Amino acid sequence: MPKTAKKHHRKSNGPIEVSSAIHTGSSAKLKKKIRDIERALKKHEKLPADKKIEYERALKGLQVELQNSQKNLKEKENASKYHMVRFFERKKATRKLKQLRKQFDEMQNTAEPSKKELKKLRKQVKHGEIDLLYVCLFPKAEKYISLYPSQSAEDINDPNVKAGLRKTEAKRLQFRKEVEKLMDEGKLLFTVDDILAGKKVYHEFYKSSTTEKEIDAPAAKEEGENGEEQDDFFE
């Protein structure tokens, strides 16, 4: 009788190698390894307790690694896609803030400064600081929502587009509130002056109100700005 080829089966309780998938950071390899472990846990329900714990820990580790890998990929995509928008909006926010600070200082140094005008300017300066922080801190893993949209919901006739713009405006205001709260509570590890000095800053928003599916409002174009100017702040 002809010899039949022997089939090689992996032992049901054999170890599943995960380090190679984790160290590569490849989403495809991570997904495959996750499926392998999930299949093993489902197929072999009577695994030894220690082996089951080992597999479950490996699965959690791989899922976290996959999430990080996808987040890093999205950040790279958005960094390229929204680079120029953020670059021009940062310049605009910086210019406006410097003008407001100058006006405030001039008002303070007058012979008899108006308390009412000082209070008004102080509030405007704070809003200018929030605008600059908004541009710099907006999560790179999410679709960037322009701080200076060229159109408002009231200028649009299409009800679907109008609804999308209103929802986007709500997200924009919500993120500004998050930034203001961080600033008021002193939870930022840098100052607005650090940004104005050109220092690189970073803050991780673990939970943001923005979502990838929101309709973004178009950004207003800056006149007189040179698009070829280099900016390593967002790179």
From Swiss-Prot:
**Pfam families noted in UniProt:** Efg1
Which intervals of the chain form a coiled coil? 25-126, 162-185
Biological processes annotated in GO = maturation of SSU-rRNA from tricistronic rRNA transcript (SSU-rRNA, 5.8S rRNA, LSU-rRNA)
Q: Where in the cell is it found?
A: Nucleus, Nucleolus
- Compositional bias of kind Basic residues: 1-12
PANTHER family annotated for this entry? Answer: RRNA-PROCESSING PROTEIN EFG1
Q: Where is the segment annotated Disordered?
A: 1-31, 210-235
Compositional bias segments (type: Basic and acidic residues): 210-224
What function does this protein fulfil?
A: Involved in rRNA processing.
Record's protein name: rRNA-processing protein EFG1
Q: Does the keyword Membrane apply?
A: no
Query: What's this protein's family per the entry?
Result: Belongs to the EFG1 family.
* Main location as per UniProt: nucleus
- Organism domain of life: Eukaryota
- Would the keyword Coiled coil turn up in this protein's UniProt record? yes
Q: Which gene encodes it?
A: EFG1
Composition bias type Acidic residues, residue spans: 225-235
**Record-linked InterPro entries:** Efg1, EFG1_rRNA-proc
Q: Which GO terms describe its cellular component?
A: nucleolus; preribosome, small subunit precursor
Which controlled-vocabulary keywords does the entry list?
Coiled coil, Nucleus, rRNA processing
